[in-house]
């Protein structure tokens, strides 16, 4: 494994960080999960993708959803983990707060 080099510059900020364009009535929504079972974890990721969410971490997605779509998603995700232990967080975020978004990344030397 290569040497970890901490990048000092800000990698992505605010709305420019993700190519997301919301429509009327839609709110940025984070989905994060912690699920032990690989099959169920993959199913949860697939459901998030089906709802047009973009993966931002191994177990995290973001995208614009209406209130109804968020509720539908919540039901599907709840049902998906019903036979396993796990935890799912669905968090709407207003644009004003999302503009405060900051992301820093450490990379291995030579991966830039």
Task: State the predicted function of each range.
Residues 1-30, 35-112:
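Basic nucleic-acid-binding interfaces
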């Amino acid at each position: 494994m290569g040497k970890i080099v901490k990048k000092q510059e800000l990698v992505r900020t605010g709305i420019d960080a993700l190519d997301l364009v919301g429509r009327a009535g839609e709110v940025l929504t984070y989905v994060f999960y912690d699920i032990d079972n690989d099959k169920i974890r993959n199913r949860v990721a697939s459901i998030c993708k089906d709802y047009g969410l973009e993966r931002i971490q191994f177990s995290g997605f973001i995208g614009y959803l209406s209130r109804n779509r968020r509720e539908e998603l919540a039901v599907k995700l709840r049902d998906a983990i019903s036979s396993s232990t796990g935890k799912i967080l669905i968090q709407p975020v207003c644009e004003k707060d999302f503009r405060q978004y900051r992301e820093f990344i450490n990379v291995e030397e030579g991966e830039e």
